[in-house]
Curated annotation (Swiss-Prot):
NCBIfam families: efp (TIGR00038), PRK00529.1 (NF001810). It is found in: Cytoplasm. Gene3D superfamilies: 2.30.30.30, Nucleic acid-binding proteins. The keyword NAD does not apply. GO terms for biological process: peptide biosynthetic process. SUPFAM superfamilies: Nucleic acid-binding proteins, Translation proteins SH3-like domain. The gene is efp. This is Elongation factor P. SMART domains: EFP, Elong-fact-P_C. GO terms for molecular function: translation elongation factor activity. It comes from Hyphomonas neptunium (strain ATCC 15444). One of its GO terms (cellular component) is cytoplasm. Keywords: Cytoplasm, Elongation factor, Protein biosynthesis. Belongs to the elongation factor P family. Involved in peptide bond synthesis. Stimulates efficient translation and peptide-bond synthesis on native or reconstituted 70S ribosomes in vitro. Probably functions indirectly by altering the affinity of the ribosome for aminoacyl-tRNA, thus increasing their reactivity as acceptors for peptidyl transferase.
């Protein structure tokens, strides 16, 4: 285990908390008030049971960061509430719980390359590619003259995810989505 100060903890890090459990960091934000002690608020998910917790630490407080191995895998198929991935190097299959995949589940596509973080040979976290391409299947019709405005409208993708898209984007358009926060990035160029 490596020791890191709270201010250096980032999304995706695996830390061992004071209760002896491993947690994956979902979000870490530092706050530096004009007066008082700077703090870091860390939102994390306990690996053993998937429970989310939010803790606030002094930015100089030391936390134990677990050594995890990044292993490239390929997504194969869903299996009930779980997902099956194949190790790209040795072709071994690994089953990952739906709780671990979390909000990224709708973005999984067959043969999609992902990175699994492994701790003692077990998957503890997953990293999806930063971009996902999908087709819009439902949205309001395109209104002439709104191509340059900053207004957005709701749309539903082929995987069922609801997003906000610019007013000029219509049904059948392929768009690129940010997998971290589910926001529209741009039209696909294919």
């Amino acid at each position: 285990m490596a020791v890191e100060i709270a201010a250096d903890i980032r999304r995706g890090n695996i830390i061992e908390h004071t209760d002896g459990q491993l947690y994956v960091v979902l979000k870490a934000e530092s706050f530096r008030p004009g007066k008082g002690t700077p703090t870091t608020t860390i939102e994390m998910r306990r690996i053993s049971d998937g429970i989310k917790v939010v803790n606030t630490f002094k930015t100089s407080e030391k936390l134990e960061k677990a050594f995890v191995e990044e292993v490239e895998h390929t997504y194969l198929y869903p299996e009930g509430d779980n997902f099956v991935f194949m190790n790209s190097a040795n072709y071994e299959q690994v089953t990952v719980s739906g709780a671990m995949v979390g909000d990224g589940a709708p973005y999984l596509q067959e043969n999609m390359p992902v990175s699994l973080q492994m701790f003692n040979g077990d998957p503890v976290s997953i990293t999806l590619p930063p971009r996902f391409t999908a087709e819009i299947v439902e949205t309001e019709p395109v209104v002439k003259g709104q191509t340059a405005s900053g207004s957005y409208k709701p749309a539903i993708l082929e995987n069922g995810v609801r997003i906000m898209v610019p007013a000029h984007v219509g049904v059948g358009t392929r768009v690129i989505i940010n997998t971290e926060d589910g926001t529209y990035l741009e039209r696909a160029k294919d």
